[in-house]
Amino acid sequence: MPLTARAGHTLHRLPLSHYWWLLLGRHSLRHVHSYLRLRKGLRLPLPWPEQECLHLHPKPYKFLLRYPCLTRQPHLLQGWPADSSLWFDPKPYHPSADSKLLPLGLITLSAFSMRVSEPTHCSGFHAADPSLSWLTGSSPWLVLLQAPGGSLFCHDVFQGRLYLLSHSVSLFLKTGLRQCEAIYRAPLWRVRPLPSLWTCRDPDTAFLPKLLARTARRGLAAFYALWRLHLGSRSELSHPVLEWERTELVLTDRRRGWPCTHLLSGSESQRVSSSDAGDTWNAATEKAAGGKEEAERGGRQQATDRLASPHLTRGRRDCGRSLQGEEPSAAEDFARCRPLLDELCGEGGWLPFAFLTASPHVCLILTEGGPVLALDLNDTSLWRIADDLELLLRLGSLLLLSGLRLPLRPPSGSGEAARKPGYEKEEGRGRATTASATAATSPRRPTRPRGVTEKGRVTTGDVPFSAHPESEEQTDGHHGRQESGHGDQRGGDGRGHRDDGARRHANDETEPQQRGEHEDGEQTDSGREEDAQESEVARRDEKGTEQGGSGRSCGRATQTYGGRGEHGAWSSIPLSVPRPDPRVWVPPPHLLFPSPLPSITPVEDEPSARPRCPPGPAEEPSKCSPCPPCPSPDAPQSAVPRLSALSVPSPSTARVRFSLSSLSSSSSSSSSSSPSYSPSPLSPPSPVSPSSPRSPFISPIRSPGLRAKPWVSSGHPVAFPPAPSSAPPFSKRVPSVPSSASPSAPCIGRSRPPSAQTA
C-alpha cells in the first residue's frame, strides 16, 4: 500500500505510519538515503502542523541552488553540501558539532489557508504566486535534517538558522515543528491558537535555563552552541525566599549592539552591523592617514571623556536616547570593557549571554571555569554573583545583590581629560571611596596606583610596581609579597629588597610632597633624618645591584628589577612578551576567582594528627574507647585540646603546612613518631587559579554536593593539631581516663597496629 497523504484520513493516521523509515537511522543513515531515493517527490503530512507537508528529496540543496535569491547571498550558503556530497555541515551554526547531517526533504510553509490535497508544482514558485510569498521571506522554507544519533534538525534557508527539533524520532512524532521558531513567522500561524498538546507554560521559561545550566558544565563551546540557537528567548530567575519576585533574562549577544525585544535571528542585520563597524573603522583610519588633526583630536577627546568618567553620561544613556532618537552605543561600551575582560578572564574565556529586562545595562557573563559575572555598563563595574549557572538558577536574583563591585576604569593622569580642573577632584573622590571600601573589607591596603614618577615607577600605598611592568609574573609577585606579610616580610628570593630600594630612590622627591598633604606641611627633624638615611640606603642598594650584575640581559639592554637599564626609565623586554597598558587598572584575578581551601590528605602512618599521652604504669588503656589527653598540673587550662573544640578553621585565618618529624629511637624504648607542624606564609596567588584568604569578597556559595569536606578513613573530619607548646610534656606519665561518649567509635589519638596500617 503506497504511503500517500489523503485529505480525509490525514488527521486520523498515526505519524509512525508515515515516518517509520526514520528509525533506519539507528543502524546507518545510508539506509535512510536509499529510502529517499526510492520515494523521491512523496509528500508526507507533518506531525504538527498537520496541514503542512514534507517533500521527500535526497538532495534538496541542489534543488534550491536554482534560485538566484539564495546564490547571491553567500552568507546563507554556509554548511551547504557540495555537488558531490550528501552531508550538511552544522559547524557554522553549531561549533561543537562532531558529525554531519543528512538532508531529508523540503518543507514549504503556506502563506494562506490551503488544502493539503491541493498539488504544489515547481512551476508555481515565482513572485507573482499569491499562495507562496517566499521571495520576501515571510513564509520560510525549511529543510529537515537527521543526525547519526537520531536527532532531528530544521534549517531555515532564508534566515540562515539551524534549529534542534528533538533528540529522538519518537519525540519528533509527538511534537513536530513546535520547537522551530521559523514556523511562527509564517502569516498563517501568527494569529492561529496553539494546539492542545502545547503546554500552558512557556517551555523556554521552564526548560531552557536548566538545559543551558547543564550544558555550561561542558565548557563555553557547548554552551555557545545552544545559546546561539535560542537567541532572543526569555527566562526568569526566581527568588529563593520571595517567590513572587522574579527577574527576567533575555538571551542576546551584547557584543553586537543594544538588545531588541524581537528575535535576533536575521543574519542580514548581523552582516549589516558588522559592515557598519568595518566602515567606521576604515573611515577612522582614513582620517588618521589623511592628517585631519581636528577630527582626530575631537574623537580622542570624546573617547578619553568616556573612558575617564563614564558616570557622567548615565542619565543621557538611560532616558535621553529614546527621546532624542539617538542610536544606543552598547557595542561601544562593550568595546571599552573587552580588553579589560580579556586580561582578567583570558582571551576567549568569557561570554556575555543575557541581560536583565528591568536593568538592560546589566549583563551576565559566563567564564570558562564556570563562574558567572555581572557587568554594569553604566559605571563599568564588575562583580561575581555565582560559582556556576546552576547555582544562579537555584538562588535567583538573591545573588545579584551580593559581592563587591570592582570598577574597571583607568586611574588618574591618563589622557587629556586629566588636565581638566574638575577631573582631579572627581578622581580623588573616587579613589578615596575605593580605598575606604577596600580597607573596610580587607586588612591590606589598596593597590591602585596614585601617580607615575619620572623614572617610570608607579607610586602606591604600600606596594611598588613598574609603570611599564616587565611581565605579568613580576606584577603578581608584588601582590603576593604584599599579602604574605608587612614590609619586613618580603619574598625569599631577595627581589623585594632591590625593589624597595629602587622605590625609595625613585620616590625620594615625591615623598615630602605626599607627606606634606597629610601633615599640613609640618615635618620634624627626625623625619628629615629618616629620609636622608633612606636615600643613602637606596643609593647603596642601587650601586650594589648595578655592580653585582643582578640584571637580566635581554638583547643589547640590561634589565633590572629596579626598572633601570641602558635605556633609562624604559625597561627592555622580549618582543614576545606583550606590554600591558599601565594606565588601565584591572583588579587582580584572585578578587573575582577565589579558589577553595585545598583538601588535606591524611597521614598514612598516623591517621590522627593529635599527640597522644603515654598511659600510666599501673593502668592499661582500653582497646575500644578513645583516650583523650588529661590536663597536666603544669600545662595551662586553655592549652588542653578537647574533642568538641577540634574543627577546621575558616580559610580566612591562615594555612598550615604539615610535616612529619620522626623521633629516632636510640635503645630498646619504643618511641612513636609525633607529627609536628610549621606555619608557612601565605603563598602569592597564581594567575590561573589564585587563592587569597584575605579577599574582600564573601566566601563563595557553592551548590550542595559539588565539594565535600575531606574525611579520614576512621570516619571523623580532618582537624588541625594543637600547637607544640600546648601539648602535655612527654616526660610525665599522666593516667588516661577512658571516655564512654562513643564506645563503638574507633580509637582517636592512638597509632594503629601494623596490620591496620598495611591494610
Curated annotation (Swiss-Prot):
Residues 406-415, 431-444, 659-680, 691-704, 728-746 have a biased composition (Low complexity). Residues 269-328, 406-759 are annotated as: Disordered. Residues 289-299, 417-430, 469-518, 525-545 have a biased composition (Basic and acidic residues). Residues 585-599, 681-690 have a biased composition (Pro residues). This is Uncharacterized protein DR1. It comes from Human herpesvirus 6B (strain Z29). The gene is DR1.
